[in-house]
Amino acid sequence: MQQVAIIGSGNIGTDLLIKIKRRSESLSVAAMVGIDPESDGLARARRLGVATTSDGVAGLLAMPEFEQAGIVLDATSANAHRANAAALAPYGRRLIDLTPAALGPFVVPAVNLDEHLSAPNVNMTTCGGQATVPIVAAISRVTPVAYAEIVATVASKSAGPGTRANIDEFTETTAHALESVGGARRGKAIIILNPAEPPLIMRDTVLCLVGDVDRDAVTESIHRMIADVAAYVPGYRLKQDVQFTPVDPAEMRILLPDDTVDVRWKVSVFLEVEGAAHYLPAYAGNLDIMTSAAVRVAERIAGAEVTA
């Protein structure tokens, strides 16, 4: 059983705690770290018998439980993660970063986890990236994707101050991941915070421009990828049939890199991500997919270390 520490006692950190305690067969939480001694996350951790500190990463380093924690999951903020990574660097811990800091490579478990199992610090990109990069990758393994555009629509209630403050970073990081992990020549990301009441489940739209293509092969690849993601995010599903729409290459040229061949088809994929409601509400699929992906990464890293 691999011991882990969680830094951040907010919604994300607390959901990580509950997920690992309830369903992980290979991970155990050694310590929960926060900066607010009155936070609900630290209180829940204490009730579950997990050691806690409200003194941040300095408090973690002083805890006897730190010696057993080989993996640290950081659910704080980009600036805090940079400081935490520097403080933890001398101790050789494996870091899983759920912030926009992106000090290490982007990891989307269904796409590229095997490539980064030995990386000292991996970044979970964004909720939109975790939901949509797999679809772009599924299409690009069949045919080149000249342009990928995603629209992530999340319940406004699920977006806290940190998410709102990092909207620009969200779009930039997600677009980068569409290219560097998904394989698109050019990526664009848009996020919508939907204020509807009652809150709606996360929806994601993926639009890809491609050349002449085998529709059956693309559709089959997308369905395989959705099954791969649903293995660790059970609420991840296709909302409608995959759609193929012919496009005018001349009209699309403005969206494409200069050296891209003409595109012929727009592939449209419509997704829904329902949360598991372990700690967060079911509509917060945007948060659940991040924590579920991070737990999968931690479990795979732990398994790789056991077999090494």
From Swiss-Prot:
Which CDD domains does the annotation name? ALDH_C
Annotated active site residues, numbered on this chain, are 127
Write the Enzyme Commission number(s) for this entry: 1.2.1.10
Q: Which GO terms describe its biological process?
A: catabolic process
Q: Which reactions does this protein catalyse?
A: acetaldehyde + NAD(+) + CoA = acetyl-CoA + NADH + H(+)
By what name is this protein known?
A: Acetaldehyde dehydrogenase 2
- Please give the SUPFAM superfamilies that the UniProt record associates with this protein: Glyceraldehyde-3-phosphate dehydrogenase-like, C-terminal domain (SSF55347), NAD(P)-binding Rossmann-fold domains (SSF51735)
Report the domain of life of the source organism: Bacteria
Q: Could you give a GO molecular-function term held by this entry?
A: acetaldehyde dehydrogenase (acetylating) activity
User: Membrane-crossing residues?
Assistant: none
Q: Which HAMAP family match?
A: Ac_ald_DH_ac
NCBIfam families (alphabetical) = ac_ald_DH_ac (TIGR03215), PRK08300.1 (NF006157)
Concerning InterPro entries, the annotation shows: Acetaldehyde_dehydrogenase, Acetylaldehyde_DH_C, NAD(P)-bd_dom_sf, Semialdehyde_DH_NAD-bd
Cite the entry's keywords alphabetically: Aromatic hydrocarbons catabolism, NAD, Oxidoreductase
Q: Which family does it belong to?
A: Belongs to the acetaldehyde dehydrogenase family.
Residues noted as binding NAD(+) in the record, renumbered to the chain = 9-12, 158-166, 286
Q: Does the keyword Phosphoprotein apply?
A: no
Quote the Pfam families the UniProt record gives: AcetDehyd-dimer, Semialdhyde_dh
